[in-house]
């Protein structure tokens, strides 16, 4: 095992982070795919297989365009020279890890000796998934609409200090004893639901040996990479408004999905982070229950759903859609400190006669000065909008900012000025190449 590296000032700024800025499904995977070609490592820092995205990339000996679905593995693996790393802040369902790995390798994407898992990563078991479903049933009309992947119950085990981590697999008798105790606790809470405890233990004995070559001391691994001047791309899961602390609680996920979760999930200090790219749709969507101030229920909503293909990669559920919410985005920018933004799915707005963005929340005759923590207040706000003329034509063939219609650029620049953050990347179509890059002029950097 490599010795623990000393703190290295040369690691300063070598990490680039891609984060969702809304309620997820912003299109982080596309930008991650593009940036991964310039990176040495692509890392996951939080969440589990409860989120997902699809990437189309050339693969195999014939270099054929192939579709890859990523849920748990870092999507930067589509770059055959990029190392994938699952950090300590992730919760990992081992069967899903191997299922996803086997699927992408069958499609020609080989991951031998370039995929690693922190030994501190917590494990998601099948009983966590059963409990997830039972809890949703128990909540009834108050359910939050989880993916039922066991993520919340696994993080609950972690927070209550009863969870099991990857390293526990390599003291298997202790693992088995702790596992039985963990399941017994769930039986006491939810009754004797159908579950084969001993069968699961037997499966994990086999999983432990198959997983062994992937397991590393996560802290030593990531800092050794940074000390070797490797460039790291961090692929955020979910998005800021699903963050356990700063999202629309309790309609959130169970992990830290913002910039703080990057440091705690990978074991790196803040000074290692050189850039934070916030990914935002040109409109807003969310899956499951929870408040949504700009939600639409008309033909515009249908347009956004159909043209934007707003169906969840993980659940297949139709996403709720509405106008871009700049009040929420300003809150997101404050917390995550984006150095630039990637505006995605702008082409979905192509044929709309007019386009709106939310600029103000009013409560009675009072303007709210911040995004409210209290969801009862959020449910009562009146949203004020700025309306733009639509550009009424396709933009998918635009390859430079100057080629975009004037009204389209007006929309982009209003968002940019409102948020005070430069929009560097603009998605103008579903294809990998349909991205306009708009770097800041050197004198403005």
From Swiss-Prot:
Keyword Phosphoprotein listed: no
EC number: 6.3.4.4
Binding site for IMP: 25-28, 50-53, 147, 161, 238, 253, 317
Taxonomic lineage: Eukaryota, Fungi, Dikarya, Basidiomycota, Ustilaginomycotina
Signal peptide boundaries: none
Any single Pfam family the record assigns to this protein: Adenylsucc_synt
Organism (species): Malassezia globosa (strain ATCC MYA-4612 / CBS 7966) (Dandruff-associated fungus)
Major location (coarse): cytoplasm
SUPFAM superfamilies in UniProt: P-loop containing nucleoside triphosphate hydrolases
Gene Ontology terms, MF aspect: adenylosuccinate synthase activity; GTP binding; magnesium ion binding
General function of this protein: Plays an important role in the de novo pathway and in the salvage pathway of purine nucleotide biosynthesis. Catalyzes the first committed step in the biosynthesis of AMP from IMP.
Positions of the catalytic residues: 25, 53
Sites where the protein binds Mg(2+): 25, 52
Cofactor binding notes: Binds 1 Mg(2+) ion per subunit.
Gene Ontology annotations for the cellular component aspect, listed alphabetically: cytoplasm
Assembly mode: Homodimer.
Name by which UniProt lists this protein: Adenylosuccinate synthetase
Pathway: Purine metabolism; AMP biosynthesis via de novo pathway; AMP from IMP: step 1/2
Positions contributing to GTP binding: 24-30, 52-54, 319, 345-347, 427-429
């Amino acid at each position: 095992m490599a010795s623990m590296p000393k703190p290295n000032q040369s690691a300063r700024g070598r990490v680039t982070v891609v984060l969702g800025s809304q309620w997820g499904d912003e299109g982080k995977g596309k930008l991650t795919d593009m940036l991964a070609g310039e990176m040495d490592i692509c890392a996951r820092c939080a969440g589990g297989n409860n989120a997902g995205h699809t990437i189309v990339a050339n693969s195999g000996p014939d270099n054929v365009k192939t579709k890859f679905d990523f849920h748990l593995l870092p999507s930067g693996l589509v770059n055959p020279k990029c190392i994938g790393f699952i950090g300590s802040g992730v919760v990992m369902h081992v069967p899903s890890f191997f299922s996803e790995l086997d699927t992408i390798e069958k499609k020609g994407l080989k991951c031998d000796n370039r995929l690693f898992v922190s030994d501190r990563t917590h494990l998601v078991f099948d009983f966590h998934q059963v409990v997830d479903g039972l809890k949703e049933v128990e909540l009834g009309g108050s359910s939050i609409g989880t993916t039922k992947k066991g993520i919340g119950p696994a993080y609950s085990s972690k927070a209550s200090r009863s969870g099991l981590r990857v390293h526990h697999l390599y003291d298997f008798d202790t693992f088995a004893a702790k596992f039985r105790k963990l399941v017994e606790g769930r039986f006491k809470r939810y009754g004797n639901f159908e579950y084969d405890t001993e069968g699961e233990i037997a499966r994990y004995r086999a999983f432990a040996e198959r997983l062994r070559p992937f397991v590393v001391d996560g802290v030593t691994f990531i800092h050794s990479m940074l000390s070797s001047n490797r460039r790291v791309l961090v692929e955020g899961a979910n998005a800021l408004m699903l963050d356990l602390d700063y999202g629309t609680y309790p309609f959130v996920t169970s992990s830290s999905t913002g910039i703080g979760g990057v440091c705690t999930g990978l074991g790196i200090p803040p000074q290692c982070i050189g850039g934070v790219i916030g990914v935002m749709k040109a409109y807003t969507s969310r899956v499951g229950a929870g408040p949504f101030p700009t939600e639409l229920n008309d033909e515009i909503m249908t347009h956004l759903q159909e043209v934007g293909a707003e169906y969840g990669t993980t659940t297949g559920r139709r996403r709720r859609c509405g106008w871009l919410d700049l009040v929420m985005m300003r809150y997101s920018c404050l917390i995550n400190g984006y150095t630039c933004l990637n505006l995605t799915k702008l082409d979905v707005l192509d044929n709309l006669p007019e386009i709106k963005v939310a600029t103000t929340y009013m409560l009675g005759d009072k303007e709210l000065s911040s995004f409210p923590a209290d969801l009862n207040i959020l449910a009562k706000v009146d949203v004020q909008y700025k309306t733009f003329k639509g550009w009424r034509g396709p933009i998918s063939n635009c390859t430079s900012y100057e080629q975009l219609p004037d009204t389209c650029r007006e929309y982009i620049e209003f968002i940019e000025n409102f948020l005070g953050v430069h929009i560097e990347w603009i998605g103008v179509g579903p294809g990998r190449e349909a991205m306009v890059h708009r770097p800041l002029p050197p004198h403005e950097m």
